[in-house]
């Protein structure tokens, strides 16, 4: 049963500054996400924007379901690309514990087209 949804759209050019500022990049993305995005060649900005949008989408989807304050950073929400091309969440720390305690299933899709990246999350139990 669907419990909640979340959606986020972001302008890809917002991530130009991330490529020049490693600290900024590492504040929002795990090392694995950075390495995966770098392998995209010319699509590195789209990849980063899509991952960021996915993280924001998950927060939006979870916010109506959570009535307690939890401590998290966007690096606790990791976006993993699987060999077949699909993507999944790899959660860490308190947010992982919360999802497991609530017995939630997460579904994610990301799309990007030149100027924009969008992500959509479905939360089910």
Curated annotation (Swiss-Prot):
One GO MF term attached to the UniProt entry: magnesium ion binding
Annotated binding of Mg(2+), by residue: 8, 56
Family assignment from sequence similarity: Belongs to the P-Pant transferase superfamily. AcpS family.
The name this protein goes by in its record: Holo-[acyl-carrier-protein] synthase
Domain of life: Bacteria
Catalysed reaction equations from the record: apo-[ACP] + CoA = holo-[ACP] + adenosine 3',5'-bisphosphate + H(+)
GO cellular component, one term: cytoplasm
Top enzyme class: transferase
InterPro entries reported in the protein's UniProt record: 4-PPantetheinyl_Trfase_dom (IPR008278), 4-PPantetheinyl_Trfase_dom_sf (IPR037143), ACPS (IPR002582), Ppantetheine-prot_Trfase_dom (IPR004568)
Named cofactor requirement(s): Mg(2+)
Function of the molecule: Transfers the 4'-phosphopantetheine moiety from coenzyme A to a Ser of acyl-carrier-protein.
EC number from the UniProt entry: 2.7.8.7
Predominant cellular place of this UniProt entry's protein: cytoplasm
């Amino acid at each position: 049963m669907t419990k909640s949804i979340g959606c986020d759209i972001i302008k890809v050019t917002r991530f130009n500054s991330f490529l020049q500022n490693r600290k900024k990049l590492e504040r929002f993305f795990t090392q694995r996400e950075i390495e995966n995005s770098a392998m995209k060649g010319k699509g590195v900005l789209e990849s980063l924007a899509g991952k960021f949008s996915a993280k924001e989408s998950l927060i939006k989807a979870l916010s109506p379901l959570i009535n307690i304050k939890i401590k998290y950073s966007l690096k606790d929400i990791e976006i993993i690309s699987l060999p077949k091309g699909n993507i999944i969440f790899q959660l860490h720390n308190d947010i992982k514990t919360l999802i497991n305690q609530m017995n939630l299933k997460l579904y994610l899709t990301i799309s990007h087209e030149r100027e924009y990246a969008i992500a959509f999350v479905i939360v089910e139990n």
